[in-house]
């Protein structure tokens, strides 16, 4: 347990240096955060409190100044005199009538101590007589009832709550200091013992219920010790818990859960800060006994091994001399007599003689002490110890520690519909952890469910669990404690375990940029306390370029000017450059920050330094870098301009060649065609195109769908459909030519879009309602007499125009009209084609007859 105390001692000395690889030789994050103006790091103390089991709430965890005080006094003389000068009425008014939301322990207890400070003026006769009566009235009528209400309000009645038990421990420390003002007891240990006795007398029924009614560690330790013996274990406690047994702890009594099992053992509860003595009967008796049981209306007689019986009672181990012990008991007796309260106590000088006669008999009562000062303990009927849920609780914690602070959840519970509660209760009673729900249910009986976190579908405990772990669980090995703590802080426990172990090479590295401030403090404590023999630089690495630059700048700046750059706003010396840092971090949104980056952002937000600068290892390099960047920008701009000039030079000869050849670009020619077309012609085109599509659809309905069609069928069908084109020919040759020109321009789109459009039309429309453009009605009867004009239209280069692509009516025309001879398929009048497939493309005869292709396209364009 020395490592635990070293951690607590290391809290007060967080300063120092940490060597984080080569980038932070003297970089101190904690020191830098403390110096930042207006920055407050909240809740840094929970990891520190949880780091120690023995001293988290221990009454011995007082400051060194209090240890150096004179014996018999709890505080300095000036403080007592200043408090003693207060009006007693003001002290009474300071005590609230109702229970406050926050516990004013320092105000209430120290106010009580100030009132009792008048006891310094008591004469020896008053101390020898009943002079403590009025002070006992103040103690029991004003102070302790209020504190009892506070303890009760904080959940002390709940057996699973440890908050109130910690309050009792804190009260005993404060009350011990207050009693030291006038008790005239020579040592602080005597004053603490007197305070605990008084608190047990006043708060015992509320804060310290009988042992069998609460889930204490001693019961779990008993079950843990005898779990492999295959014997029933019975436990019992005495009825009156306000009877004080004081025994001389000379180290001869073994510790339960740590040492070998003996008839008399002791157990120290880290939560209650109280010691329990355990008397074990039938330990060496391996005989059997007949047991009658009822099953299905029948009485069965079975033989079982004689159960082990454990009788428990609280006691106070002391190492003082007999005179000091009797002086303390006498003081408590006279103080309680002032309020007409009797106390029963006994001092056992020789602890080896405890229970000698009791273990050899079947009596359920035990008499301790010598006449006339004797105490009789009457024990209850022994009950089955396995009914205590604490046994499962400590087994759970043992598994937790053995697996590095985590528990592998088993298969999911087979919860029956409508019986989830019964299934969970069954799992808890059997100690089976199959789901997060059963784990929470089991843990909630011993500690708050808020202490359970779920990280990556695995349960992890918060640091407050460290105050719940007794000594018999970790048995002095602190490594599982640190691993549990690391897991509760969501650290990589594998890396921490390798770092804490003295064997092996370098551990797995952790990126320092991903650490939170609490995680950094915890690792720093382990390093400063000497628990981690390997340096912190072996564990932490800096992989972010910004963090490396940041640390290098801070180390350089502090080494050059002796101050961190975060406090430059308070420096008036002109020789120190007033350069702001961390300004770049202000551009990062708060929702995307994490870990140390968030803390740095807080530093930036709270600082008065608003200018932007570059974080470099040397301040003089700023101007050089700006000049270099300006030069690079100029070169990039010049290169872009030269690239534009080259592109213009490449385009000029192309236009010149086109002018010499007498050709025009497709866009230019298309614009000319649009300008030549009258408006009425456009209307005629629309109406004609609509009529044409309608008539073709009507003809299409009459056409039977076959998988293959020969040339004769195509000609016959085309002959029937020939009448559908006669209204279009009646409009005149000029209009027909213009319609063909405009429609042909809309057909030259990219090949990919054509195929997609054709497939969509084929799938969306029923096969009987396909447009006639999808059918190969190719015949020379529909070819216009003016073949030369048709040849010009087909020979035009392909142009994709936005206007034609948006036209919904023209999109119903055939989409595969390329004249490049590829194997993708052409609309020819030769060979067979598949109508049922929906494509209407021919792949076997593609590109065979060039003249037929042109004629087919002319047909479709008409």
Curated annotation (Swiss-Prot):
Tell me the gene name. ORF1
Instruction: Mark out the compositionally biased spans (Basic residues).
Output: 751-760
Question: InterPro entries given for it?
Answer: EJC-associated_protein
Highest taxon of the lineage: Viruses
Q: Which GO terms describe its biological process?
A: RNA splicing
GO MF term list:
RNA binding
Q: Where is the composition biased (Acidic residues)?
A: 57-69, 78-91
Q: Which GO terms describe its cellular component?
A: ASAP complex
Q: Which organism is it from?
A: Ictalurid herpesvirus 1 (strain Auburn) (IcHV-1)
Q: What is this protein called?
A: Uncharacterized protein ORF1
Q: Where is this region: Disordered?
A: 45-91, 633-824, 837-862
Record field: compositional bias (Basic and acidic residues): 633-650, 657-686, 694-703, 761-779
């Amino acid at each position: 347990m020395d490592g635990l105390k070293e951690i607590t001692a290391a809290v007060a000395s967080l300063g120092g240096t940490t060597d984080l690889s080569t980038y932070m030789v003297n970089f101190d994050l904690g020191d830098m955060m403390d110096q930042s103006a207006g920055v407050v790091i909240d809740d840094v103390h929970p990891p520190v409190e949880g780091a120690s089991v023995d001293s988290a709430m221990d009454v011995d965890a007082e400051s060194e100044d209090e240890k150096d005080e004179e014996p018999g006094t709890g505080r300095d003389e000036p403080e007592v005199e200043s408090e003693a000068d207060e009006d007693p009425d003001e002290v009474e008014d300071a005590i609230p009538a109702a229970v406050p939301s926050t516990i004013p322990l320092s105000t209430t207890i120290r106010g009580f101590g100030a009132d009792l400070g008048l006891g310094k003026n008591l004469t020896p006769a008053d101390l020898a007589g009943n002079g403590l009566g009025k002070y006992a009235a103040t103690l029991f009528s004003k102070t302790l009832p209020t504190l009892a209400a506070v303890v009760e309000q904080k959940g002390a009645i709940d057996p699973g709550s440890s908050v109130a038990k910690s309050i009792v421990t804190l009260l005993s420390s404060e009350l011990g200091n207050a009693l030291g003002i006038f008790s005239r007891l020579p040592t602080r240990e005597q004053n603490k013992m007197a305070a605990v006795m008084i608190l047990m007398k006043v708060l015992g029924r509320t804060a310290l219920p009988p042992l069998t009614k609460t889930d204490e560690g001693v019961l779990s330790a008993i079950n843990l010790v005898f779990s492999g013996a295959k014997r029933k274990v019975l436990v019992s406690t005495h009825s009156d818990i306000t009877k004080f047994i004081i025994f001389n702890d000379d180290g001869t009594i073994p510790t339960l859960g740590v040492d070998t099992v003996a008839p008399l053992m002791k157990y120290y509860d880290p939560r209650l800060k109280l010691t329990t003595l355990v008397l074990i009967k039938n330990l060496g008796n391996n005989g059997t006994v007949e047991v009658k049981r009822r099953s299905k209306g029948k009485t069965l007689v079975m033989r079982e091994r004689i159960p082990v019986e454990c009788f428990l009672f609280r006691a106070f181990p002391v190492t003082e001399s007999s005179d000091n012990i009797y002086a303390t008991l006498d003081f408590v007796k006279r103080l309680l007599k002032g309020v007409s309260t009797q106390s029963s106590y006994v001092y056992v000088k020789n602890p080896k003689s405890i229970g000698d006669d009791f273990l050899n008999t079947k009596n359920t009562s035990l008499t301790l002490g010598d006449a006339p000062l004797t105490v009789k303990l009457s024990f209850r009927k022994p009950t089955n110890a396995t009914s205590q849920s604490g046994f499962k609780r400590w087994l759970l914690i043992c598994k937790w520690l053995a697996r590095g602070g985590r528990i592998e959840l088993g298969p999911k519970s087979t919860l029956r519909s409508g019986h989830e509660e019964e299934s969970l209760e069954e799992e808890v009673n059997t100690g089976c952890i199959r789901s997060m729900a059963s784990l929470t249910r089991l843990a909630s009986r011993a500690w708050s469910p808020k202490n359970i976190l779920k990280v990556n579908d695995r349960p992890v405990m918060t640091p407050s669990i460290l105050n719940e772990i007794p000594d018999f669980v970790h048995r002095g090995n602190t490594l599982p404690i640190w691993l549990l703590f690391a897991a509760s802080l969501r650290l990589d426990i594998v890396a921490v375990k390798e770092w804490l172990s003295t064997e092996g090479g370098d551990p797995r590295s952790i990126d320092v940029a991903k650490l939170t401030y609490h995680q950094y403090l915890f690792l720093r404590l382990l390093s400063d306390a000497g628990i981690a023999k390997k340096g912190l630089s072996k564990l932490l690495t800096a992989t972010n370029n910004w963090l490396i630059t940041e640390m290098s700048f801070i180390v350089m700046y502090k080494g050059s000017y002796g101050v961190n750059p975060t406090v430059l706003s308070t420096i008036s010396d002109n020789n120190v450059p007033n350069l702001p840092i961390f300004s770049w971090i202000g551009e990062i949104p708060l929702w995307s920050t994490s870990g140390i980056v968030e803390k740095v952002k807080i530093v930036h937000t709270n600082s008065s330094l608003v200018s932007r600068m570059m974080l470099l290892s040397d301040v003089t390099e700023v101007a050089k870098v700006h000049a270099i960047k300006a030069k690079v920008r100029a070169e990039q701009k010049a290169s872009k301009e030269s690239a534009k000039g080259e592109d213009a030079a490449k385009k000029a000869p192309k236009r010149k060649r086109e002018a010499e050849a007498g050709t025009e670009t497709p866009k230019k020619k298309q614009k000319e065609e649009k300008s030549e077309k009258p408006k009425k012609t456009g209307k005629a085109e629309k109406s004609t195109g609509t009529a044409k599509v309608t008539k073709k659809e009507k003809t299409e309905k009459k056409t039977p769908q076959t998988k293959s069609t020969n040339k004769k069928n195509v000609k016959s069908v085309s002959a029937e459909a020939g009448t559908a084109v006669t209204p279009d020919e009646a409009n005149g040759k000029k209009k027909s030519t213009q319609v063909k020109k405009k429609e042909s321009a809309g057909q030259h789109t990219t090949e990919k879009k054509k195929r997609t459009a054709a497939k969509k039309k084929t799938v969306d429309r029923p096969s009987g309602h396909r447009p006639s453009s999808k059918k190969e009605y190719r015949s020379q009867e529909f070819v216009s007499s003016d073949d030369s004009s048709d040849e010009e239209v087909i020979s035009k280069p392909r142009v994709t125009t936005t206007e034609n692509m948006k036209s919904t009516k023209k999109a119903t025309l055939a989409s595969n009209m390329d004249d490049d001879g590829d194997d993708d398929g052409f609309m020819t009048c030769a060979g067979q084609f598949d109508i049922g497939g929906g494509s209407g493309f021919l792949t076997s005869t593609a590109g065979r007859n060039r003249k037929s292709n042109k004629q087919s396209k002319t047909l479709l364009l008409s």
